[in-house]
Amino acid sequence: MLNEILSGSSAAVISGLVGFYISKKITNANFDIYVEKAKAQAGAIENEAQLLLYKANIKSQEIEQEATKLYENAKDRAKADLSLREEDVNRKEQTFKRYKQNEERRLQDEVSTLKARQVDLKRNEKSLSSLKKRYEDKIDEALNAIEHCAGMTKEEATRVLLEKVEEKSRSEIAHVVRRYENEAKVEAKKRANYILAQATSRFAGEFAAERLTNLVHLNDDELKGRIIGKEGRNIKTLETLLGVDIIIDDTPNAILVSSFNLYRRAIATKTLELLIQDGRIQPARIEEIYNKVCEDFEADTLSEGEEIVIDLDIGVMHPELVKLIGKLRYRASYGQNALSHTLEVAHLAGIMASEMGGDARLAKRAGLLHDIGKALTHEHEGSHVDLGVQVCNRYNEHSVVINAIYAHHGHEEINSIECGAVCAADALSAARPGARREVLESFLKRVTAIEEIASQHSGVKQAYAINAGREVRVIVNASLINDDESILLAKEIASEIEHGVQYPGEIKVNVIRESRAVEFAK
């Protein structure tokens, strides 16, 4: 068995070796074939490369020959061109030399001619000098003969002649001037009427006559008792704080707020309306509502002033001036609302300045600010003209605005078209029938004077004229004025009013000194 296995294994090994040997021979034979093929291909490539190199050498020789030929041709052309240029330059040089020679000969001829003329001129000059002298001698002889015959000298004759000419000319000039003056007056009147007609027809202003009372509506007459309060505390607080008269009478569902000061009256009216809506009518709540209304009115005046500046399209303006414009809503002059009057003047001035060829925007700006001092009159000393000039100078307003403030009351001459338009518009607005009431204005001046007299004393916090000017209520600082000094202060104010203000009847001076202590429990 073992022998069989060994014999089988030997046969297999021998078969494998024979197969390996045969495959090795076949592989070597194939490799030799590949090598021969590769050598044949390499030889073919080498032959082809040599052929290409040969062709390239031939091509390069042809290109070199062509380049040499082109170079020679270009060289020949350049030489020919250079030769032509040299001939042209030589020809131009010869031409220039001939031109130069001709010009030199011409200049020599002209110089010779000028010298000859100069000699002739000198000869003629001598001849003219002698003729001039002979002419002057003849004129002197003629003048002497005329003076001898006329019996007057040359200066006298000249003066007489000039006097006659001047007399005749003066008469003619006066006639012409008078004719042109008449024509100018007629034309100016026509032009002025046209401008006024244009201004008044293009602007329709509102009529605003201010009253002295405001009406506050009540939902129920029982509210009158609550407004008066226990022992009159509420109404005393209201009148003292607001500085107005609160009139509670038999008028159903209404109370009246009376004051000549439009600003205080408007604040009082708004305060009462808010108190009625709130329902809590007591001194502490009254002060709280009053302070809130004052803050709201300050903001509203600024907002209204900004709207007016934007509507008029007059450019940027300082916020303080804008606020003062809004405050004009609560000022009046001869019963005419100051803001309505100011707006009317601004619009009219803009239209008239435009018709006359001026700056319409500047005229409107000057018209809007011409009475700005009225917004400060009750707070500062001085006329509204001086106050207006001060505030406008402080905020660097245009010189035309300053001139308009002065000129509309005749304090300065009119210096511009815009200023003239403002003055004309102011007169037009004030002279309109029904625009102003003289009696009301005199009353307001009297009441304002009473308040100013009371306010100028030391220790006075506030002073209000009430009851149509028949009573002045003076609120003093309790820490500065004692009870005895209050009596003396009332007498001093009464004496000054007697000597400084003209008024019918009598005026009651009521000095109020209130001491209040406030503390908070925390």
UniProtKB/Swiss-Prot annotation:
InterPro entries on file: HD/PDEase_dom, HD_domain, HDIG_dom, KH_dom, KH_dom_type_1, KH_dom_type_1_sf, Ribonuclease_Y, RNase_Y_N
GO BP, sorted A to Z: mRNA catabolic process
MF terms in GO: RNA binding; RNA endonuclease activity
Localization of this protein: Cell membrane
Highest taxon of the lineage: Bacteria
KH domain segment(s): 212-278
Lyase is among the record's keywords: no
Membrane topology: Single-pass membrane protein
Family matches, as SUPFAM superfamilies: Eukaryotic type KH-domain (KH-domain type I) (SSF54791), HD-domain/PDEase-like (SSF109604)
Membrane spanning stretches: 7-23
GO CC terms: plasma membrane
Keyword annotations of the record: Cell membrane, Endonuclease, Hydrolase, Membrane, Nuclease, RNA-binding, Transmembrane, Transmembrane helix
Residue span, HD domain: 338-431
Keyword Membrane: yes
Pfam families: HD, KH_1, RNase_Y_N
The enzyme's E.C. designation: 3.1.-.-
Broad class of enzyme this protein falls into: hydrolase
Alphabetical list of NCBIfam families matching this protein: HDIG, RNase_Y
UniProt record similarity statement: Belongs to the RNase Y family.
Alphabetized HAMAP family for the sequence: RNase_Y
Role summary: Endoribonuclease that initiates mRNA decay.
Protein's name in the database: Ribonuclease Y
Organism: Sulfurimonas denitrificans (strain ATCC 33889 / DSM 1251) (Thiomicrospira denitrificans (strain ATCC 33889 / DSM 1251))
Gene name tied to this protein: rny
